[in-house]
């Protein structure tokens, strides 16, 4: 366990020695050297991590901890296709999805890249057919809208990417279809999406590895009925449905031509699947060339993660800074603040990536962890967050580390807007670090001591700033892969399995009999609270038919 490692104990002592030091003092001593020492560039991303409560010794000890915890060895095992997902006895080889055609990735001794490349060829052909108008609905009309039906990784990842790259929808000379994403089993979401669409011009992508996911299949069957209710004959449905799945029999039974099924594999976790055929929605929305560039960006970050020394390794540095705050400062949350509306869904994507991966209490050896694991991850796009929760980040009783992310060139620009956006991003990070003292306020002429007390900012609040020149598919791919590997690094240090998600299973199991009871079956055995909730819901449902 990590707490037995020499570097962990050294970091505890080091934390006690520096925890009251002010970052502003370190910057005053030699800020330019500090920025040079605590900044990195890789795969089109620039990371400034100088506004953290760290010294060179801190980083030396954190990187020593990464080494002692086995980060390099576990990284190499992942790239080698070993079964690092121990509880499911699987590889976690999502990096192979973005590999070049000649790469030698194997699972259980079998090369996987040829199968991946075959799916990519089919994705290119299909997406180009839809975007060019060669693939039509049953009436011969062009597809103008695509609905992606999936949940979790089959929704959050591709939805985030499509939103981030929406400015590229016309870059290949074709007008991409409008993308809609439906995930929730709440029928309101699907109903509201469908009421705006023409079934003759709409294509459905049903994303489910097993083709049995409750929410996804409920929505898929309702979408199927929508076509039938609107005059599309059952034998014509195949022109309006494609599947992303591994279950050929279930896909065929649903009425989708297996020729229009795009496969992926059980060694790809849902939250890492946007690089696979789950990314078909991305290829349809912005063109396959953009999707290929996304893969190339992820591949560039993979190569950096695999080869860079720990002290110059961006995922390792970010991961270990997260360990520093979660386990030594005992900070329970972290904030993602992208200063780009295009990246507004990135915080939600990170919530699944980090909390589903590392929200664990059991180590690889089956023993309970003795440290905190994943923080609560949250955030929204700037500058909106400044007018919502940044008050708490600046002056609240709880310190929240922030990651600021900003493209220097906007995807779309109105005169003067982007300079204001960047100014606010940089100012927030500076204000969190510097703070504002009572002496500064008095020197500025303020004399009301009560007001001064309320206007003091303690400062010394940490942040990272990640910059990119512009938000290209390549850079977005690198950004996503950066946080994937950061999450992996932290899981290795905590000695947990970042690739399973047993925590979502129990609720699914309990929901099945409750659904039957809500539909009139005899009440089962529940605690008093759950039984009362079921009874109340049954009464209302009965009155409303």
UniProtKB/Swiss-Prot annotation:
Active-site annotation: 356 (proton donor), 387, 508
Leader sequence segment: none
Known pathway: Carbohydrate biosynthesis; gluconeogenesis; Carbohydrate degradation; glycolysis; D-glyceraldehyde 3-phosphate and glycerone phosphate from D-glucose: step 2/4
Mitochondrion is among the record's keywords: no
Record key words, sorted: Cytoplasm, Gluconeogenesis, Glycolysis, Isomerase
Single GO biological process annotation from the record: glucose 6-phosphate metabolic process
Catalytic activity: alpha-D-glucose 6-phosphate = beta-D-fructose 6-phosphate
Chief location of this protein within or outside the cell: cytoplasm
CDD domains in alphabetical order: SIS_PGI_1, SIS_PGI_2
Protein EC: 5.3.1.9
PROSITE patterns reported for this sequence: P_GLUCOSE_ISOMERASE_1 (PS00765), P_GLUCOSE_ISOMERASE_2 (PS00174), P_GLUCOSE_ISOMERASE_3 (PS51463)
Superkingdom of the organism of origin: Bacteria
Cell location: Cytoplasm
SUPFAM superfamilies the record matches: SIS domain (SSF53697)
MF annotations from Gene Ontology: carbohydrate derivative binding; glucose-6-phosphate isomerase activity; monosaccharide binding
Enzyme's top EC category: isomerase
CC annotations in GO: cytosol
Purpose of the protein: Catalyzes the reversible isomerization of glucose-6-phosphate to fructose-6-phosphate.
Family the entry assigns: Belongs to the GPI family.
Record's protein name: Glucose-6-phosphate isomerase 1
Species this protein is from: Cupriavidus pinatubonensis (strain JMP 134 / LMG 1197)
């Amino acid at each position: 366990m990590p707490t037995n490692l020499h570097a962990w104990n050294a970091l505890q002592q080091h934390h006690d020695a520096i925890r009251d030091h002010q970052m502003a003092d370190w910057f005053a001593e030699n800020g330019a050297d500090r920025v040079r020492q605590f900044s990195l560039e890789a795969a089109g991303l620039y990371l400034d991590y100088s506004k953290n409560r760290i010294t060179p010794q801190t980083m030396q000890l954190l990187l020593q901890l990464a080494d002692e915890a086995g980060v390099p060895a576990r990284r190499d095992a992942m790239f080698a296709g070993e079964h690092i997902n121990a509880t499911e006895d699987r590889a976690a080889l999502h990096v192979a999805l973005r590999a070049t055609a000649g790469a030698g990735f194997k699972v259980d001794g079998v090369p996987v890249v040829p199968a991946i490349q075959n799916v990519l060829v089919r994705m290119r052909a299909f997406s180009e057919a839809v975007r060019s108008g060669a693939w039509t609905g049953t009436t011969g009309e062009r597809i103008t809208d695509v609905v992606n039906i999936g949940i979790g990784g089959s929704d959050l990842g591709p939805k985030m990417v499509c939103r981030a790259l929406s400015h590229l929808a016309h870059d290949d000379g074709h007008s991409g279809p409008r993308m809609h994403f439906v995930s929730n089993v709440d029928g309101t979401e699907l109903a509201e999406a469908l009421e705006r669409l023409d079934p003759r011009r709409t294509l459905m992508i049903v994303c489910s590895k097993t083709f049995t996911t409750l929410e996804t299949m409920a929505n898929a069957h309702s979408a199927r009925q929508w076509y039938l209710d609107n005059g599309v004959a059952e034998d014509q449905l195949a022109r309006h449905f494609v599947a992303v799945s591994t279950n050929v029999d279930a896909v065929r039974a649903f009425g989708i031509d297996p020729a229009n099924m795009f496969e992926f594999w059980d060694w790809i976790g849902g939250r890492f699947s946007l690089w696979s055929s789950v990314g078909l929605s991305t290829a349809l929305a912005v063109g396959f060339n953009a999707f290929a560039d996304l893969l190339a960006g992820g591949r560039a970050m993979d190569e950096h993660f695999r080869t860079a020394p720990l002290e110059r390794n961006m995922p390792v540095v970010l991961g270990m800074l997260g360990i520093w705050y979660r386990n030594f400062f005992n900070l329970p949350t972290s904030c993602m603040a992208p200063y780009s509306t295009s990246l507004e869904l990135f915080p939600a994507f990170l919530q699944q990536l980090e909390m589903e991966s590392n929200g664990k209490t059991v180590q690889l050896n089956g023993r309970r962890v003795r440290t905190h694991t994943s923080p609560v991850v949250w955030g929204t796009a700037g500058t909106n967050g400044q007018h919502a929760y940044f008050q708490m980040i600046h002056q609240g009783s709880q310190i929240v580390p922030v990651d600021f992310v900003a493209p220097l060139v906007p995807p779309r620009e109105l005169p003067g807007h982007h300079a204001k956006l960047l100014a606010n991003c940089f100012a927030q990070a500076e204000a969190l670090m510097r703070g504002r003292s009572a002496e500064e306020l008095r020197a500025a002429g303020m004399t009301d001591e009560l007001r001064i007390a309320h206007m003091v900012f303690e400062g010394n609040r940490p942040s990272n700033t990640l910059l990119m020149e512009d938000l290209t598919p390549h850079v977005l791919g690198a950004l996503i892969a950066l946080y994937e590997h950061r999450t992996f690094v932290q899981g290795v240090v905590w000695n947990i399995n970042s690739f399973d998600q047993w925590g979502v299973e129990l609720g699914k199991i309990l929901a099945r009999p409750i659904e039957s009871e809500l539909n009139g079956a005899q009440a089962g055995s529940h605690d008093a609270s759950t039984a009362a909730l079921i009874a109340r819901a049954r009464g209302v449902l009965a009155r409303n038919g």
